């Protein structure tokens, strides 16, 4: 019994310089490498306040496996996190602690607002509820729903990763005054508040 002849290795001299460099080296810019490492290594800090948090923690179960996106390391301290996920109803008494937690996070930092209550106050158009968490901290991704499904949280992570991958942030950035960045724009909800409060009759079902 004879063995088949071994395939001779390709001599290095027969490869072009471009082929040899492509097999042995990785060429990129420091900004692209930093963005790639950041988007695949998110350290979330969960701030759950209501029923949306139940759907949020479901993403950590094996059924959805958030670890696939490099965001499974839940941090107990905001000083070790770079992603803040706000889910649930944000009351005015919780706004100051939430802002303090955000300011303790290391830069660069990102924020996901999960659910209708965190996005715009939801159905609680009352004095004690903040009408959107973006009133006092910048938000990168909004997740609609009441409550949103766990798949929506995964979609938000993918959207955030795409956003981080295209960013050209410096290695360190300090978020200061947000005036002029779109966070202080008037909301249609507030513009029509007087009109809603003046209504005394409900619309019939056929007009809804």
From Swiss-Prot:
Binding site for [4Fe-4S] cluster: 51-52, 117, 146
Ranges of biased composition (kind: Basic and acidic residues): 185-197
PROSITE patterns cross-referenced by the UniProt entry: COMPLEX1_20K
Naturally occurring in which organism (per UniProt): Rhodopseudomonas palustris (strain BisB5)
Reaction catalysed by this enzyme: a quinone + NADH + 5 H(+)(in) = a quinol + NAD(+) + 4 H(+)(out)
A Pfam family matched in the record: Oxidored_q6
InterPro entries per record: NADH_UbQ_OxRdtase-like_20kDa (IPR006137), NADH_UQ_OxRdtase_20Kd_su (IPR006138)
Enzyme superclass (EC): translocase
Main location: membrane
GO biological process: aerobic respiration; electron transport coupled proton transport
Superkingdom of this protein's organism: Bacteria
Protein name: NADH-quinone oxidoreductase subunit B 1
Annotated region described as Disordered, given as residue ranges: 182-208
Species lineage: Bacteria, Pseudomonadati, Pseudomonadota, Alphaproteobacteria, Hyphomicrobiales
Cofactors, names only: [4Fe-4S] cluster
Reported function: NDH-1 shuttles electrons from NADH, via FMN and iron-sulfur (Fe-S) centers, to quinones in the respiratory chain. The immediate electron acceptor for the enzyme in this species is believed to be ubiquinone. Couples the redox reaction to proton translocation (for every two electrons transferred, four hydrogen ions are translocated across the cytoplasmic membrane), and thus conserves the redox energy in a proton gradient.
Keyword line: 4Fe-4S, Cell inner membrane, Cell membrane, Iron, Iron-sulfur, Membrane, Metal-binding, NAD, Quinone, Translocase, Transport, Ubiquinone
Membrane topology: Peripheral membrane protein
Family: Belongs to the complex I 20 kDa subunit family.
Cofactor: how bound: Binds 1 [4Fe-4S] cluster.
Subunit structure: NDH-1 is composed of 14 different subunits. Subunits NuoB, C, D, E, F, and G constitute the peripheral sector of the complex.
EC number: 7.1.1.-
GO molecular function, one term: iron ion binding
